[in-house]
Amino acid sequence: LSQAVLLYSKQKPYLEGIIYNKSHHITEPDEKYYVPKASEISIDTGLKSKLEVEEHGIKIGSPVVYKPQSVEMKNDCIAGTSVDDRAGCAVLLELARHLKKRKSGPTVHIVFSVQEEFNLRGAMSAAHQVRPDIAIQLDLMLATDTPETTEYGDMILGEGPGMSLFSFHGRGTLNGVIPHPSLVNLMELSAEQKEIKLQRSAQVGVLTDLSYIQQ
């Protein structure tokens, strides 16, 4: 609630809006700790009528996203909109710059997939076309260095990249990934040679495109 959003329309790249929040002065006690459903949320764009909304190209199904913002914090930390998985995109772009300089080596395909959060099928078409021998997925890793998350693992923000040794959705789909031991050894050896801290993780409730790429 009270979050800035962007509504994409045909007339402009977007319209700015705010998720409507009932005034604190008229909020009932039982409403103050209630999380509204998506169907109960309204967005105020400043437009005064249904006709005005339609004239600006806003229709049922028009995309709405949170307005991007970012904050630089201490110790090289950042907070922002959609860091999952723009951080992964940044890593891949830097990788592409390094690969461009090499003279020889195996073929590397870099894929930026879509709809991973929605149905996990965004990377499947690329996998069917490329048919890779090895697939490496870059995605978020659940940090467990705050008081309420310590029971879920030992992943500390800023202590190096994390390598998933086990992932399983566990909520409605029997799918996950256990990486091949030889690839795990390769990652650990490479990290050791480059003096890169490498953390390890095993999680239930986490699923990425890699679960479907391997099919």
Regions flagged by a language model, labelled:
Residues L1-Q215:
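N-terminal hydrophobic/helix-forming segments and targeting peptides
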